[in-house]
């Protein structure tokens, strides 16, 4: 689909580390991680439903209301892989590939400060909801996932949250 639609995509996170440093997969990282620039991500989300072969399912908060994450997963519905953190949810639990949007970090210093302030504000607000030993972005994602599960009104603002959280951390994208 990426090739057919001429979409730009990247291998990221543990998948990129495994490919570069280990020449394959990292044993403790059991999924594949792909990221697309926001515009390409939106095209993929829009087109995937009618282009995916039988048995594959694009999972996100638009396709399954109970899905607790702010990115998408491409699931194989003919398989089962239970993630401990979401095992009780009534959602598709097939083997998956994580698909993340990448948002451009603003070039304007004022916009950068506002974005960083918004990230900090969200982090502080969410840290009150649930204390954790995790820090930084991992903690923020954990808190958002819990909010999605327990507090349905967060879905109303998910696009804004996605854009704040998927901007590169202090790096401007080209």
Predicted regions and their residues:
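Conserved aromatic-histidine-acidic binding/catalytic patches
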Residues: 32-33, 87
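A short secondary-structure junction signal
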Residues: 108-115
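Non-catalytic, alpha-helical, charged scaffold/linker segments
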Residues: 121-125
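Conserved catalytic core of two-metal-ion nucleotidyltransferases
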Residues: 1-5, 48-107, 126-174
């Amino acid at each position: 689909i990426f090739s057919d639609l001429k979409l730009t995509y990247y291998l990221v996170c543990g998948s990129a580390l495994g490919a570069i440093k280990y020449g394959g997969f990292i044993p403790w990282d059991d999924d594949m991680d792909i990221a697309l620039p926001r515009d390409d991500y939106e095209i993929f989300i829009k087109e995937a439903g009618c282009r995916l072969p039988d048995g594959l399912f694009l999972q996100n908060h638009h396709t399954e209301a109970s899905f607790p994450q702010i990115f998408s997963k491409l699931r194989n519905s003919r398989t089962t892989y239970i993630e401990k953190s979401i095992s009780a949810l009534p959602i598709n639990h097939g083997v998956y590939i994580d698909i993340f949007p990448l948002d451009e970090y603003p070039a304007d210093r004022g916009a950068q400060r506002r974005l960083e302030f918004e990230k900090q504000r969200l982090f502080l607000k969410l840290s009150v909801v649930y204390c954790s030993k995790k820090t930084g972005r991992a903690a923020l994602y954990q808190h958002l996932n819990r909010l999605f599960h327990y507090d349905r009104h967060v879905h109303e603002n998910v696009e804004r949250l996605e854009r704040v959280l998927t901007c590169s951390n202090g790096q401007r994208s080209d």
